[in-house]
Amino acid sequence: MAEQTNTPDLKPRSRDVTDGLERTAARGMLRAVGMGDDDWEKPQIGVASSWNEITPCNLSLDRLAQGCKDGVFAAGGFPMQFGTISVSDGISMGHEGMHFSLVSREVIADSVETVMQAERLDGSVLLAGCDKSLPGMLMAAARLDLASVFLYAGSILPGIAKLSDGTEREVTIIDAFEAVGACARGLMSRADVDAIERAICPGEGACGGMYTANTMASAAEALGMSLPGSAAPPATDRRRDGYARRSGQAVVELLRRGITARDILTKEAFENAIAVVMAFGGSTNAVLHLLAIAHEARVELTLDDFARVGRRVPHLADVKPFGAHVMTDVDRIGGVPVMMKTLLDAGLLHGDCLTVTGRTVAENLAHIAPPDPDGKVVRALNDPIHPTGGITILSGSLAPGGAVVKSAGFDEDVFTGTARVFDRERAAMDALEDGTITAGDVVVIRYEGPKGGPGMREMLAITAAIKGAGLGKDVLLLTDGRFSGGTTGLCVGHVAPEAVDGGPIAFVRDGDRIRLDVAAGTLDLLVEPAELERRKQDWRPLPPRYTRGVLAKYTKLVGSASVGAVCD
């Protein structure tokens, strides 16, 4: 009888395609892509990338994938590279294309799962560079529960716009959206808009502020799914090539140690990610995406967890869209490890969580020994921007299933205003351009939820235009859709239940009074219950926008934003 061993099998799946007489044809196919007799005993590692030439966010991934493959080879594995899709939110914003953004997250996760399962690959390095590809890759890792390492493409460098008054201004993509609103109100010349347009994207990399991509890259590092320190360096920085090679080596080592994604993606790891997002004042999309990743990891995570962590973790980072700095500044002062060490020292992080290094969070940080916060980009705990986190979870009569607001940068906790109701975003944009939205209004944009939109479009075009028009602190916008990571101002999203499901937002009318209390975490429609019941009598939801194709399928499958808008 053969002696049993606890040594993990380095080929737990790929033996299905390499071993035995019956796999002669499969081996013949694999020989054609470079495998030989010496490779059959090597673990096969999928190197999945969302590289494309549509958006600068992903341009570095082809180069980084090669580095990952080099690392896999060096560690004794055999890499197998394949691609998946990616949608540019910056290009698809403000028109029909944005309906297809969030669904791309599901397509990415599904496509990676499909290839990994069909080809029986043993582990994966997952590379992504923009908003939906990051959570899509992490969802795939959680769903597959194999040895997996995530690698971010890196952020873009800020551009410098030379304006007509002779000044120079550091700009990112969000400045372009805000310039549109300013120009429409006569507050900026077309020449300055053109100067900003030409400067915002000086090269490759994801949008440079603490927008969704950088927020999710920071969250991935906090989760333990990417190498420590790998989130912050810019896309053009050659340190990324080193991280790529080490990521390839790390996944083979995870196989040797029998560590899979769900060993890392525990409830405590998600609390770490939430804490880092709160401290950075990151994108509200992180709520949606972390809920979805947790769902795939079979971890029970709810909006209450975000609220609980947010109440005890202070907002420490002065970063865009509401602050002064970008991700390259975070990198300059030591990267995400600076924030993590600050939180760990305060008892606000779980130091015993396992990571892709095979070490714990605390061990990684002790090895790196990051510097203390610089006091400008990241403040000390005793000098926070705000004593609670940069995202607030809301509930109340207008959002009984929950809602989300980026409270980072709020000047006042309470806003009470008069409803201006619009079915879908375009009508609201028209009203703003006509000058009929004024201070004190609550702009309600409904039928933009995951199912009703469909696709839960980001509202950056309208929010940036409101800010550019000088109304950012005087107009509250709320929607069952969502917002870009670049959104600032009085913006409440993810209102649940959504309008198409008969949530209270469906029954708001022009002239209703609405009250937001950020400190109390409440969002209320100040209308008598009896009146709301009368409004429901003859209500019918808007008909589906799409009856064929991917969004028709998505409409039938997608769940509420309050549980991550997952498709099960």
From Swiss-Prot:
<dbReference type="InterPro" id="IPR037237">
    <property type="entry name" value="IlvD/EDD_N"/>
</dbReference>
<comment type="pathway">
    <text>Amino-acid biosynthesis; L-isoleucine biosynthesis; L-isoleucine from 2-oxobutanoate: step 3/4.</text>
</comment>
<dbReference type="GO" id="GO:0000287">
    <property type="term" value="F:magnesium ion binding"/>
</dbReference>
<feature type="binding site" description="via carbamate group">
    <location>
        <position position="132"/>
    </location>
    <ligand>
        <name>Mg(2+)</name>
    </ligand>
</feature>
<comment type="pathway">
    <text>Amino-acid biosynthesis; L-valine biosynthesis; L-valine from pyruvate: step 3/4.</text>
</comment>
<dbReference type="GO" id="GO:0051537">
    <property type="term" value="F:2 iron, 2 sulfur cluster binding"/>
</dbReference>
<dbReference type="Pfam" id="PF00920">
    <property type="entry name" value="ILVD_EDD_N"/>
</dbReference>
<keyword id="KW-0100">Branched-chain amino acid biosynthesis</keyword>
<feature type="binding site">
    <location>
        <position position="130"/>
    </location>
    <ligand>
        <name>[2Fe-2S] cluster</name>
    </ligand>
</feature>
<protein>
    <recommendedName>
        <fullName>Dihydroxy-acid dehydratase 1</fullName>
        <ecNumber>4.2.1.9</ecNumber>
    </recommendedName>
</protein>
<comment type="function">
    <text>Functions in the biosynthesis of branched-chain amino acids. Catalyzes the dehydration of (2R,3R)-2,3-dihydroxy-3-methylpentanoate (2,3-dihydroxy-3-methylvalerate) into 2-oxo-3-methylpentanoate (2-oxo-3-methylvalerate) and of (2R)-2,3-dihydroxy-3-methylbutanoate (2,3-dihydroxyisovalerate) into 2-oxo-3-methylbutanoate (2-oxoisovalerate), the penultimate precursor to L-isoleucine and L-valine, respectively.</text>
</comment>
<keyword id="KW-0001">2Fe-2S</keyword>
<feature type="modified residue" description="N6-carboxylysine">
    <location>
        <position position="132"/>
    </location>
</feature>
<feature type="binding site">
    <location>
        <position position="57"/>
    </location>
    <ligand>
        <name>[2Fe-2S] cluster</name>
    </ligand>
</feature>
<dbReference type="GO" id="GO:0009099">
    <property type="term" value="P:L-valine biosynthetic process"/>
</dbReference>
<dbReference type="InterPro" id="IPR050165">
    <property type="entry name" value="DHAD_IlvD/Edd"/>
</dbReference>
<feature type="binding site">
    <location>
        <position position="131"/>
    </location>
    <ligand>
        <name>Mg(2+)</name>
    </ligand>
</feature>
<dbReference type="InterPro" id="IPR000581">
    <property type="entry name" value="ILV_EDD_N"/>
</dbReference>
<comment type="similarity">
    <text>Belongs to the IlvD/Edd family.</text>
</comment>
<keyword id="KW-0456">Lyase</keyword>
<keyword id="KW-0479">Metal-binding</keyword>
<feature type="compositionally biased region" description="Basic and acidic residues">
    <location>
        <begin position="10"/>
        <end position="22"/>
    </location>
</feature>
<dbReference type="InterPro" id="IPR004404">
    <property type="entry name" value="DihydroxyA_deHydtase"/>
</dbReference>
<keyword id="KW-0460">Magnesium</keyword>
<keyword id="KW-0411">Iron-sulfur</keyword>
<dbReference type="InterPro" id="IPR056740">
    <property type="entry name" value="ILV_EDD_C"/>
</dbReference>
<feature type="region of interest" description="Disordered">
    <location>
        <begin position="1"/>
        <end position="22"/>
    </location>
</feature>
<dbReference type="GO" id="GO:0004160">
    <property type="term" value="F:dihydroxy-acid dehydratase activity"/>
</dbReference>
<feature type="active site" description="Proton acceptor">
    <location>
        <position position="484"/>
    </location>
</feature>
<comment type="subunit">
    <text>Homodimer.</text>
</comment>
<feature type="binding site">
    <location>
        <position position="89"/>
    </location>
    <ligand>
        <name>Mg(2+)</name>
    </ligand>
</feature>
<feature type="binding site">
    <location>
        <position position="458"/>
    </location>
    <ligand>
        <name>Mg(2+)</name>
    </ligand>
</feature>
<dbReference type="InterPro" id="IPR020558">
    <property type="entry name" value="DiOHA_6PGluconate_deHydtase_CS"/>
</dbReference>
<keyword id="KW-0028">Amino-acid biosynthesis</keyword>
<dbReference type="GO" id="GO:0009097">
    <property type="term" value="P:isoleucine biosynthetic process"/>
</dbReference>
<feature type="binding site">
    <location>
        <position position="207"/>
    </location>
    <ligand>
        <name>[2Fe-2S] cluster</name>
    </ligand>
</feature>
<dbReference type="Pfam" id="PF24877">
    <property type="entry name" value="ILV_EDD_C"/>
</dbReference>
<keyword id="KW-0408">Iron</keyword>
<dbReference type="InterPro" id="IPR042096">
    <property type="entry name" value="Dihydro-acid_dehy_C"/>
</dbReference>
